[in-house]
């Protein structure tokens, strides 16, 4: 059955006159072998495919590249070479004078200890990624079979450990602790490290076990205030679809979060699948994600970095939202936009964030729409940037969204102070797709009717008309007859 028309999907000039939801007309899963399909004749289609409608996923780096990447991440994370203030008792104190960020917004702070400048810890760091290999990606070499020397208890030879610490010396001088030191701190807490995941922007993540926990756990060791901020947020949350905080340890300026271990993240899970998820599975993932977002928003929190890499999964019926390091608390009225600043990932950021406009909690709805799209298609990422770095990534990302969705000039925000409208509305002047109709990208993918409708609602270009998670959960997709 051809997909329904989407005229009037987004138009909501008055909250009291919301566009009615079309009735559910197709409840059977529809995923043919071909990714592309021909929609109904009465549905308007923009001419020609977008340039980067389904970019390929980047390959996984090998172990040598992982170490190089680690050096670059650590070296770039700190630009301030000042050391922290130390009180009479030897404890580190935060320098409040230079802190102009709000206390409840995740932001980096400088933690540095001079004794790490010349220290090369003997505690080895496990080198293999905790994720299973992904088809189409080069598997990292197994460092446990390395012939360069005797392998340590957790997976690295002394030679590899020395190389890793030498590469991290510059980062250490700027206040970051080397991964070997983080591993030593974690093992000092009684954890046995079984593997290390690719480090993120905040620190290192270890696959660990402990006598106090019957199952494997994840220890996230971070040196930035955002890790402590994440712990403070997680303590306030209690929802089955949100990653729970099992325990918290702070040692030597490093915050260690103890979290339950899931099978993998949603990105890896989808990358490994040879075929898309079924309709019921997509619905289950979407329902859990939107339920978690609705709960977080009711707590006055904006996640700001919802993406497949930050969603953890055992089965499609058992997922959870994690990584609250970029989250912030709502300032003032929840429906009033505020300048919280840019955060998260450019590929999944909402247009108003990319443009530098004030925003509300509905930026998470945009990101959730992209996650649901990837869950339904599984071989493509909508609006994804090319692999090569761009000089003006935010500007280019907005241009990609306008081009690939064929955004109409009437679909831009109407308030006069919108930078998105003032700076980018002219770029949509050549788009001849009628306003409030199906976005141009829908012509390229075979997605179940009700799932496509959910995605289109979540990807409403004007944030003022974008629905909340609670509104999306009332769609017919989640209430089949």
UniProtKB/Swiss-Prot annotation:
GO cellular-component term (any): host cell nucleus
CDD domains to which the protein is assigned, alphabetical: PKc (cd00180)
PTMs per UniProt: Phosphorylated by UL13; this phosphorylation regulates subsequent phosphorylation of UL31 and UL34 by US3. Autophosphorylated.
Coiled coil, from the record: none
Reaction equation(s) it catalyzes: L-seryl-[protein] + ATP = O-phospho-L-seryl-[protein] + ADP + H(+); L-threonyl-[protein] + ATP = O-phospho-L-threonyl-[protein] + ADP + H(+)
Major localization listed first in the record, in broad terms: host cell
Annotated stretches, region: Disordered: 12-63
Residues involved in ATP binding: 197-205, 220
GO molecular function annotation: ATP binding; protein serine kinase activity; protein serine/threonine kinase activity
Subcellular location: Host cytoplasm; Host nucleus
GO biological process: symbiont-mediated perturbation of host apoptosis; symbiont-mediated perturbation of host chromatin organization
Active site: 305 (proton acceptor)
Enzyme Commission number: 2.7.11.1
Compositionally biased residues, Pro residues: 47-61
Domain Protein kinase residue range list: 191-478
Keywords: ATP-binding, Host cytoplasm, Host nucleus, Host-virus interaction, Kinase, Modulation of host cell apoptosis by virus, Modulation of host chromatin by virus, Nucleotide-binding, Serine/threonine-protein kinase, Transferase
Subunit and interaction comment: Interacts with host LAT; this interaction prevents LAT activation of TRAF6.
Family: Belongs to the protein kinase superfamily. Ser/Thr protein kinase family.
The protein's role, per its UniProt record: Multifunctional serine/threonine kinase that plays a role in several processes including egress of virus particles from the nucleus, modulation of the actin cytoskeleton and inhibition of host immune response. Phosphorylates UL31 and UL34, two critical regulators of capsid budding from nucleus to endoplasmic reticulum, thereby facilitating virion egress. Modulates and redistributes host components of the nuclear envelope, including LMNA, emerin/EMD and the nuclear matrix protein MATR3. In turn, facilitates nuclear pore impairment and capsid release through impaired nuclear envelope.
Protein name (Swiss-Prot/TrEMBL): Serine/threonine-protein kinase US3
Gene that encodes the chain: US3
């Amino acid at each position: 059955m051809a997909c329904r028309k989407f005229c009037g999907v987004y138009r909501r000039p008055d909250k009291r006159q919301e566009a009615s939801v079309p009735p559910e007309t197709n409840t059977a899963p529809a995923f043919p072998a071909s990714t592309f399909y021909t929609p109904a004749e009465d549905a308007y289609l923009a001419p020609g495919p977008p340039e980067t409608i389904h970019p390929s996923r980047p390959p996984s780096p090998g172990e040598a590249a992982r170490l190089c990447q680690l050096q670059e991440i650590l070296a770039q994370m700190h630009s301030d070479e000042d050391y922290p203030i130390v009180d009479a008792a030897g404890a580190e104190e935060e320098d409040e004078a230079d802190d102009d960020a709000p206390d409840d917004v995740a932001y980096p702070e400088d933690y540095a200890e001079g004794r790490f400048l010349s220290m090369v810890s003997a505690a080895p760091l496990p080198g293999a990624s905790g994720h299973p290999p992904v088809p189409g990606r080069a598997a990292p070499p197994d460092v446990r079979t390395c012939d360069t020397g005797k392998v340590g208890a957790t997976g690295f030879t002394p030679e590899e450990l020395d190389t890793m610490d030498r590469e991290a010396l510059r980062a250490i001088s700027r206040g970051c602790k080397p991964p070997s030191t983080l591993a030593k701190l974690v093992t000092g807490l009684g954890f046995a490290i079984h593997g290390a995941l690719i480090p993120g922007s905040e620190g290192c993540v270890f696959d660990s076990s402990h006598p106090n926990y019957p199952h494997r756990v994840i220890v996230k060791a971070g040196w930035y205030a955002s890790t402590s901020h994440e712990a403070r947020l997680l303590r306030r949350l209690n929802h089955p679809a949100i990653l729970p905080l099992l325990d918290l340890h702070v040692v030597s300026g490093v915050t260690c979060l103890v979290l339950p271990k899931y099978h993998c993240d949603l990105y890896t899970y989808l990358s490994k699948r040879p075929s898309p998820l079924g309709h019921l599975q997509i619905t289950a993932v979407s329902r859990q994600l939107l339920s978690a977002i609705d709960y977080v928003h009711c707590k006055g929190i904006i996640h700001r970095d919802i993406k497949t890499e930050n969603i953890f999964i055992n089965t499609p019926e058992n997922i959870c939202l994690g990584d609250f390091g970029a989250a912030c608390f709502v300032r003032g009225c929840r429906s009033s936009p505020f300048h919280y600043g840019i955060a998260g990932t450019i590929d999944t950021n909402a247009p108003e964030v990319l443009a530098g406009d004030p925003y509300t909690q509905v930026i998470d709805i945009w990101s959730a729409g992209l996650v649901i799209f990837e869950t339904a298609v599984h071989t493509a990422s909508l609006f994804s940037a090319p692999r090569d770095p761009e000089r003006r990534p935010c500007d280019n990302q907005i241009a990609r969204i306008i081009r690939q969705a064929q955004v109409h000039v009437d679909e831009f925000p109407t308030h006069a102070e919108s930078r998105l409208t003032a700076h980018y509305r002219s770029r949509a002047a050549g788009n001849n797709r009628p306003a409030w109709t199906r976005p141009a990208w829908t012509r390229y993918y075979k997605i179940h009717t009700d799932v496509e409708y959910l995605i289109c609602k979540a990807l409403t270009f004007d944030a003022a008309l974008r629905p909340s998670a609670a509104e999306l959960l009332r769609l017919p997709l989640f209430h089949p007859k």
